[in-house]
């Protein structure tokens, strides 16, 4: 009997120890499967009371598990670190306002679980990874790549047509409920829509005469509407009073962004060079439906040419851009047989902050006209990828190094002409450029194939 009692006692003790062991396992701290490797993000999260082990894995305590929204506004956290927020098991909403993001925001940097996003106070014009879209039977059809139930946008986003418009219309077509709002001109949020204002009444009247089908009144267009049959392929061109009787009265070309930035319109060009007024525009993102973009005396906040794969004519002046990357355009990168009425032209002058110009390195190297004038911050330019031209103007008073074309032929009237024909190309330079050794070597080598001239508004050095 005593032995039996001892057995019962030992069994009870073992059972209690077993329960204690189970309780101990349940109380062991739990950590995220993946670590936060970005030190900046970890510092921010620690300051908010979240805890991490020595390997960067987050403690999944009540605070972490109950976090469904996270305020990272004003932290300027790198977007590359945002993927690591997947350590939060129940996080759905992010406030990223006032973080200095832009001009492009990469939606793919977000964890897929994020369905609410506040981007107010950022300078975002473009999105990567939000939608893919194409035109089918005059309708824009979109595939949404990242679903949102809440999306708050900065005012700069009103110039985005390629991503936000199809995201909005596709959600509307599928009857999805999305709290989609955008900051208006007064600085407050309002429900997103596809109506956009052309504020200058004379410019609006000019555009309405060309594209009446997308105007909802005298000064507003609907960026989701397709162009009428007769409007497709219509160019925006303002250079002379003969083109528009009220051209002198236009004080602003704001709103032209909605045309330049609409990749769903058929091929056309935008050319505004009536130089009596200084204009300004916001973000420009021409895609492969724009063959020419000419904006003379026009300040430009942002210009993205990364997808301007059909652009062969670019003319700019009086803006504050610091770099121009032409490597994805057709400028000096177009086969002669494919030259169109707009030619192959690059003109840039009176842009005080321009420091760098990039040309396609392995292109066909043919330009009809290339003009670089009054670019005081441009110290070096490499034109070695150019092999044929009709006119070349280099008026760079602060230039320290000009790498000249490997000049092989003269471009003339749609043909490439051998030097033996006696035809010559125009070569105009400023005195400072003439004094560069590379210029003197270029002249010495090709003098008989070149003739002296100056572009309108600039006085050149008579090197010949």
Regions found by a protein language model. Give the residues of each.
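N-terminal capping/linker segments that flank leucine-rich repeat
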Residues: 22-84, 93, 123, 134-135, ...
